[in-house]
């Protein structure tokens, strides 16, 4: 297995892997995400490629000048539980470290306990921050979240539950 920047011939396979792994959402275009990552100077899509030149895993890594970020870490289902996810994260950390960025982070949906456990096992910890977002495209009408603040946001900001 070798880890290297994703070759163009495997772009479609990477998008399929992300879809098969449940990483895509209707409001995010994974093909556009991939194109932006590989064409930007501050990001890259890394690939684990097998001896048969097939795609085994991916991770999108980049930085904003202050923090490194990881997205789309996906391992082919037939390759899971063999240490490949850990190897991909180590490659992402090396990529970020080589750019003298002092911190790397990622986002995981709170309901995805298995994935949270994977990252905790690698030494990652909850940063105890609230991530807020706003759509700037035509997809802003998609209901991304309930209209009331989540329990976690209410707790963090010490806002009482309006339903109570």
How should these model regions be labeled?
Residues 38-39, 116-118, 139-141:
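Short secondary-structure transition/capping segments
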């Amino acid at each position: 297995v070798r880890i290297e920047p994703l070759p163009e011939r495997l772009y479609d396979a990477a998008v399929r892997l992300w879809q098969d792994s449940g990483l895509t959402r209707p409001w995010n275009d994974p093909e556009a995400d991939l194109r932006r990552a590989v064409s930007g100077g501050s990001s890259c899509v890394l690939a684990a490629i097998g001896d048969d030149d097939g795609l085994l895993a991916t991770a999108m890594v980049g930085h904003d000048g202050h923090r490194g970020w990881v997205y789309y870490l996906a391992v082919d289902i037939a390759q899971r539980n063999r240490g490949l996810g850990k190897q991909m994260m180590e490659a992402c950390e090396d990529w970020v470290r080589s750019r003298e960025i002092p911190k790397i982070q990622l986002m995981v949906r709170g309901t995805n306990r298995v994935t949270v456990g994977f990252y905790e096992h690698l030494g990652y910890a909850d940063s105890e921050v609230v991530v807020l977002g706003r759509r700037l495209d035509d997809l802003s009408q998609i209901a991304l979240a309930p209209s009331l603040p989540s329990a976690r946001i209410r707790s963090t900001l010490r806002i009482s539950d309006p339903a109570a």
